[in-house]
């Protein structure tokens, strides 16, 4: 999914990622990746402003799956909370500003999921919905397995 995102969208995701205080491990991986890419020492990369680090990282299409997933999740938390909240509301899942309250949410019923997917796809841009569904599947394939194989996952 990361490679299919535009450089602008990847940069926005990377910027949100650098602000994520819980992504220290992935940020270290990103620093090493940028350092290799621009031939800087990691210490020099760490001292770059967030916008520069985000631009460098957003320009790299080939990153690890773990790093890509973390950036996509950070992007959603920063820029897509209304969509996240709308989907959870449609499913009747308790949340706080798009973040699920329950540590282990119950798998949605197929009929409820079908209806929620359809309604969300009508209210929000197709590409945004697809990226969100992929992020859910990556985070918790057991709970969100009902999203697999749906046409709404298609990213052009």
What is the predicted function of each stretch?
Residues 1-23:
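Charged, amphipathic alpha-helical stretches
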Residues 12, 41-43, 150-152:
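Small/flexible residues
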Residues 19-146:
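Acidic, low-complexity, intrinsically disordered interaction modules
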């Amino acid at each position: 999914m990361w490679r299919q995102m535009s450089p602008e969208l990847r940069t926005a995701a990377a910027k949100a990622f650098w602000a994520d205080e819980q992504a220290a491990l992935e940020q270290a991986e990103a620093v090493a990746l940028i350092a290799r890419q621009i031939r800087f020492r990691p210490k020099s990369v760490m001292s770059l402003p967030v916008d520069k680090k985000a631009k460098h990282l957003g320009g790299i299409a080939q990153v690890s799956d773990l790093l890509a997933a973390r950036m996509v999740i950070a992007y959603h938390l920063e820029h897509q909370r209304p969509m996240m909240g709308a989907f959870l509301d449609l499913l009747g899942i308790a949340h706080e500003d798009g973040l699920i309250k329950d540590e282990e949410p119950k798998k949605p019923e197929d009929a409820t999921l079908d209806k929620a997917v359809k309604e969300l796809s009508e209210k929000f841009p197709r590409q945004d919905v697809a990226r969100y569904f992929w992020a859910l599947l990556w985070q918790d394939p057991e709970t969100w397995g009902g999203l697999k194989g749906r046409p709404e996952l298609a990213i052009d």
